[in-house]
Amino acid sequence: MRVLAALSGGVDSAVAAARAVDAGHDVVGVHMALSRTRAQHRTGSRGCCSIEDASDARRAADVLGIPFYVWDLSEEFTDTVVADFLSEYAAGRTPNPCVRCNEHIKFSALLDRGLALGFDAVATGHYARIERGAAGVPELHRAADAAKDQSYVLAVMGPERLARSLFPLGEVPTKDAVRAEAAARGLSVSAKPDSYDICFVADGDTQGFLRSHLGSQPGPVLDTDGREVGAHDGAYAFTVGQRKGLRLPRPAADGRPRYVVDVRTASNTVVVGPAELLSVRDVLGERPVWLAEEPHEWTDATVQVRAHGAALPARIRTVTDDDGASHLAARLAEPLRGLAAGQSVVAYDGTRVLGQATVAATGRDAVAAAPALAGVGSTA
């Protein structure tokens, strides 16, 4: 099988490519250039596309004895991932750019280009497993290493893309085992640190990145009774559940901490309140992607709402709005704090991914949009 190995310049993708070679595939390495920003190209940059990353990817390919290319996908990346990140924050939502990158770049632009060139699949260093179910249909499962599992950010792929993907690290027990294997193979990236920053925010300052693109937009901070208790430089910079950075001039009358409970970008207003207002049980997700049969009746499952969050017991089903659009509805067994629109909600049956959607509404707003939720118990 002809396999295109995505080489980021890190240890995971290098070992994944090595394992693809070991499996007997005809492997070609490719490094994706995703930015034309000088700050991200500089040596030592923590974002994507640094000179060091490209050089490390090339050295890994040399050690493995595979051809290596750099593909410029910066236009696609900017027009989809970065643009979505900015527009979502501008709309008062909290996006996950890694999900969008997997959806639009790694398993879309990269995969499509590879297929057009005669490749059969793309191999990446993601921690997840693909198993074959009934009639050979691919299933996405959690990785053996629960601490590194990335099925949450891969659930957006869809079954057709999943069938063209390889995750050679899915069964590896620990990241230490990956590093040891890299060292044994003579890969220079064996001790290279992991990257946890948003890749296109080179200095790690997300708020500064947003300000530089969206500008200063002064507005009021209100309490839940509508009283002005502070000011901000842009509602887009806040997310539900946030406490840090509010800079309120005086404490609440009851002395309790205040958190962001709503972001109203139409009026450029941030609303703050006590922690208990953050607890919700109902979630409505839009644009669902299913990797299993859609549940048209209430079904027991677990859901995950953050990249490294816990698996939360819930009941899920699909619902249809007045316009005929399908949604994923979920009722959590226990209330959850700080869930914001724009985040991804992923449903699981054990280790298997059932489906994914983008959070559109929570709590009573979710019930108002999906009345079916009202029949599953009390609403938080």
Curated annotation (Swiss-Prot):
Record's subcellular location: Cytoplasm
Chain spans, region Interaction with tRNA: 148-150
Keywords: ATP-binding, Cytoplasm, Disulfide bond, Nucleotide-binding, RNA-binding, Transferase, tRNA processing, tRNA-binding
One of the GO BP terms on file: tRNA wobble position uridine thiolation
Pfam families: tRNA_Me_trans (PF03054), tRNA_Me_trans_C (PF20258), tRNA_Me_trans_M (PF20259)
Site (Interaction with tRNA): 126, 343
Gene3D superfamilies: Adenine nucleotide alpha hydrolases-like domains (2.30.30.280), HUPs (3.40.50.620), Translation factors (2.40.30.10)
Active site: 101 (nucleophile), 199 (cysteine persulfide intermediate)
S-S pairs: 101-199
Assigned EC number: 2.8.1.13
The protein's enzyme class: transferase
Protein name: tRNA-specific 2-thiouridylase MnmA
Natural source organism: Beutenbergia cavernae (strain ATCC BAA-8 / DSM 12333 / CCUG 43141 / JCM 11478 / NBRC 16432 / NCIMB 13614 / HKI 0122)
Lineage: Bacteria, Bacillati, Actinomycetota, Actinomycetes, Micrococcales
